[in-house]
Design a protein with these regions (language model features):
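Charge-dense, helix-prone N-terminal extensions
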Residues: 1-115
C-alpha cells in the first residue's frame, strides 16, 4: 500500500475523517480520536503508525520494518518504517481493528451521534 491507498481505505470506514496536524502528519480519526497517522513527508522514520492490541503490538514489533511508534508505543501503537513492511491483506484488517478499538472507547454519547 502507499499513502493514497491507506488514505482511501481509512476514509472508507464509517464516519472516519482526516486532519493535518503537527506540521506534516495526516491523522485519521473517528469521533475526533485518532486511530492512524501517516507522515506526509518521507524521511521521518515512520511512514504510518496505528493503534493495536497489546498482543498484536508485541507480535508486530518483532517484524523487520515495524517499530514501536514514537511517543505512542505505551498506548500500543506500532510504526511502519516503510509501506511494504506489511502486505495489504494484513495491513487493512489492522487499520480496521485500530478504527474499531478507538470507536469502542468513545463515550456512548459520541458513538450515538455517529449513527
Amino acid at each position: 500500500m502507499d499513502i493514497e491507498s491507506v488514505r482511501s481505505f481509512c476514509l472508507s470506514l464509517p464516519h472516519a475523517d482526516e486532519k493535518v496536524q503537527w506540521g506534516n502528519d495526516l491523522l485519521f480519526r473517528i469521533g475526533e480520536k485518532m486511530f492512524a497517522v501517516c507522515a506526509l513527508e518521507p524521511g521521518h522514520g515512520v511512514l504510518l503508525s496505528f493503534k493495536c492490541t497489546p498482543e498484536k503490538f508485541a507480535e508486530l514489533v518483532e517484524q523487520d520494518g515495524i517499530i514501536p511508534a514514537p511517543y505512542m508505543a505505551r498506548h500500543h501503537w506500532v510504526g511502519l518504517e516503510r509501506f511494504d513492511a506489511l502486505p495489504e491483506r494484513e495491513l487493512k484488517p489492522l487499520l480496521k481493528n485500530a478504527y474499531q478499538m478507538v470507536l469502542d472507547k468513545l463515550p456512548k454519547k459520541v458513538r450515538m451521534q455517529l449513527v
